[in-house]
From Swiss-Prot:
Additional information: In vertebrates, 3 forms of this ubiquitous glycolytic enzyme are found, aldolase A in muscle, aldolase B in liver and aldolase C in brain.
Family named by the database record: Belongs to the class I fructose-bisphosphate aldolase family.
Residues with the Phosphoserine modification: 36, 132, 272, 276, 299, 301, 309
Keyword Acetylation: yes
UniProt-recorded name of the protein: Fructose-bisphosphate aldolase B
Residues recorded as bearing N-acetylalanine in the entry: 2
Catalytic activity: beta-D-fructose 1,6-bisphosphate = D-glyceraldehyde 3-phosphate + dihydroxyacetone phosphate; beta-D-fructose 1-phosphate = D-glyceraldehyde + dihydroxyacetone phosphate
Molecular functions per Gene Ontology: fructose-1-phosphate aldolase activity; fructose-bisphosphate aldolase activity
GO cellular component, one term: cytosol
Keywords linked to the UniProt accession: Acetylation, Cytoplasm, Cytoskeleton, Glycolysis, Lyase, Phosphoprotein, Schiff base
Length: 364
């Protein structure tokens, strides 16, 4: 017999629910700026800029110091540990700059993946040890939500039952610990787009993964109204020769969500998964126009798909500040419109925005 021992007080629930709803209110989404030092190095290398702490700080300062109107498009920003404690040129903490704009500050909490022995190179997530203490410290230091990314792949015998169950339980344990410490957990079970599988196969796997995740969240007494989901869109594998329209992606994606994600979840913020900036926006717009019941806000939590044009415009040069910030604002506004189903594609948007951002076996 299941006995109920309250996991959260009504005050804790109210605070978590309000924060989650605030992040995705009125077409707002999330800027994922939580790339690790190594991942940021790969980005900077492409524009021939050295991967130093100062260069990483300078680029992120450009993103965070844009006009305050960005808060109409961006409801939350996910930071990496380093960035939470960095300051702008005037000595002001980035987290304070964001909060003054009304943007909720989040923090990456997972510590990468580790191999699952006995599987076909599948992984689980590290970072549960000491997580409660880290959450408490981050909350004290201004963070109000967390992010934890689990990775599942479609391949021969993958994802295995073990990988699905292990990652679902780890996500649920993380979510529970977050909520105990006053952080809204972003639950990210990513079915990565590596492979040649078709969209229908991805839909089948995504449904199995999400069903397991919500069973685990229920088992761990996670308060769904105080969470957000960050899933992949349902797309074909990157090497699949068959191409699908945004409308087909939208129908498959919303169908999968409709079958697996409880209506209590306030928002679903899609990851961009290496899509070009423009494709990520077009797919999100089609998802919001999909003629199926959609009880949740359907928004974005994009990293590369919000930053690629801005990074290309910057090129490591301080004099490119204006064009860099304009490029970022343009993508933020486009995705906010898409989150309301109001984006209008205006033909070519420039080479950076239509370039695929796919990286095989992508790690943050």
């Amino acid at each position: 017999m299941a006995h109920q021992f309250p996991a959260l007080t009504s005050e804790q629930k109210k605070a978590l629910s309000e924060t989650a709803r605030r992040i995705v209110a009125n077409g707002k989404g999330i800027l994922a700026a939580d790339e690790s030092v190594g991942t940021m190095g790969n980005r900077l290398q492409r524009i021939k800029v050295e991967n130093t702490e100062e260069n990483r700080r300078q680029f992120r300062e450009l993103l965070f110091t844009v006009d305050s109107s960005v808060s109409q498009s961006i409801g939350g920003v996910i930071l990496f540990h380093e960035t939470l404690y960095q300051k702008d040129g005037q000595g002001k903490l980035f987290r304070d700059i964001l909060k003054e704009k009304g943007i909720v500050v989040g923090i990456k909490l997972d510590q990468g993946v580790a191999p699952l022995a006995g599987t076909n190179k599948e992984t689980t997530v590290q970072g549960l040890d000491g997580l409660s203490e880290r959450c408490a410290q981050y909350k004290k230091d201004g963070a109000d939500f967390g992010k934890w990314r689990a990775v599942l792949k479609i391949d021969n015998q993958c994802p295995s039952h073990l990988a699905i169950q292990e990652n679902a339980n780890t996500l649920a344990r993380y979510a529970s610990i977050c909520q105990q410490n006053g952080l809204v957990p972003i639950v990210e079970p990513e079915v990565i787009p590596d492979g040649s599988h078709d969209m229908e196969h991805c839909q089948y796997v995504t449904e199995k993964v999400l069903a397991a995740v919500y069973k685990a969240l229920n088992d761990h007494h996670v308060y769904l109204e105080g969470t957000l989901l960050k899933p992949n869109m349902v797309t074909a594998g990157h090497a699949c020769t068959k191409k699908y329209t945004p409308e087909q992606v939208a129908m498959a994606t919303v169908t999968a969500l409709h079958r697996t994600v409880p209506a209590a979840v306030p928002g679903i913020c899609f990851l961009s998964g290496g899509m070009s900036e423009e494709d990520a926006t077009l797919n999100l717009n089609a998802i919001n126009l999909c003629p199926l019941p959609k009880p949740w806000k359907l928004s974005f939590s994009y990293g590369r798909a919000l930053q690629a044009s801005a990074l290309a415009a910057w090129g490591g040069k301080a004099e490119n500040k204006k064009t860099t910030q304009e490029a970022f604002m343009k993508r933020a506004l486009a995705n906010s419109q898409a989150a309301k189903g109001q984006y209008v594609h205006m033909g070519s948007s420039g080479s950076a925005s239509t370039q695929s951002l796919f990286t095989a076996s992508y790690t943050y």
